[in-house]
């Protein structure tokens, strides 16, 4: 009889433990910035609005992710993250800092938001994920400001490839993070690359490109670093900006109450069987 009871209880335990896997199945989420409302109108071609931190909030939170921003009231400058839906692909220079070179967000839906990053003087973690969020990747492209600067040159930065087109220029985004085991990893993505032997292969990214970030594991703080072959006395000459949209993450929920109860029953069964063995031995 005891063996029959034990078998039935253990069968129930097996079912509950198998349920643990289902309870912990990951599901995908997307940080798409659509719950945010840009507050400053852009007066250039295409119109649209942007937010650059001038309200002094120091950043924004959306879909469980925190994006840091620093705004300097003295100079009206900013660094870290902003968000925008401007669509100017033709105006060069710093007045057009908030437009993706695609002229539209990743979903190709006019008026939708995306994020724009401007590198601080000292790169530091600027994107923090909520607990249990594991980054999978994001869609990334150039800003119009950076792309036209590399394509044509300007008063501060060179034309990529130089006059002949043979100079091996590049513009690199490095995304790094440290996982829960203390392991640091970096993912590199070239926003422009003119290092090819055949100049026809040289490129400046002008579409939304998927960047796989699974190598970063469960890192909760991400650091973004921009570097370029065009460096002068005061550092990098290439405008230190890029655009990001639809950051994809997986999220593992906490164990459910059912699983917790199941574990308790399993322990209770073990105690029950031990007492039976002791009773039979007496």
Please annotate each region the language model reported.
Residues 34-37, 167-251:
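Terminal, low-complexity interaction segments
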Residues 150-173:
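Short coil-to-beta strand junction motifs in C2/discoidin
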Residues 270-282:
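C-terminal membrane-anchoring or membrane-association module
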């Amino acid at each position: 009889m005891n063996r029959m009871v034990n078998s039935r209880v253990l069968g129930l335990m097996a079912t509950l433990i198998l349920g643990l896997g289902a309870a912990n199945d990951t599901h995908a989420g997307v940080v798409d910035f659509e719950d945010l409302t840009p507050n400053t109108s852009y007066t250039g071609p295409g119109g649209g609005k942007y937010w650059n931190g001038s309200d002094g909030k120091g950043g924004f939170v959306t879909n469980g992710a925190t994006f840091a921003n620093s705004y300097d009231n003295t100079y009206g400058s900013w660094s870290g993250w902003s968000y925008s839906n401007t669509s100017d692909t033709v105006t060069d220079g710093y007045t057009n800092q908030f437009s993706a070179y695609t002229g539209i967000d990743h979903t190709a839906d006019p008026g939708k938001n995306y994020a724009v990053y401007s590198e601080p003087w000292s790169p530091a973690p600027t994107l923090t994920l909520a607990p249990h969020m594991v980054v999978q990747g994001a869609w990334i492209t150039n800003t119009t400001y950076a792309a036209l600067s590399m394509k044509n040159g300007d008063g501060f930065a060179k034309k990529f490839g130089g006059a002949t087109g043979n100079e091996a220029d590049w513009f690199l985004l490095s995304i790094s993070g440290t996982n829960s085991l203390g392991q640091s990893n970096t993912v590199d993505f070239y926003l422009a690359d003119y290092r090819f032997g055949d100049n026809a292969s040289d490129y400046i990214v002008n579409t939304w490109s998927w960047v796989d970030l699974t190598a970063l594991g469960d890192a909760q703080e991400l650091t973004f670093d921009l570097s370029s072959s065009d460096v002068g006395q005061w550092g990098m000459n290439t405008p230190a900006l890029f655009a990001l949209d639809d950051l994809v993450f997986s999220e593992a929920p906490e164990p459910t109450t059912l699983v917790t109860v199941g574990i308790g029953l399993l322990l209770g069964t073990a105690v029950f069987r031990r007492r039976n063995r002791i009773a039979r031995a007496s």
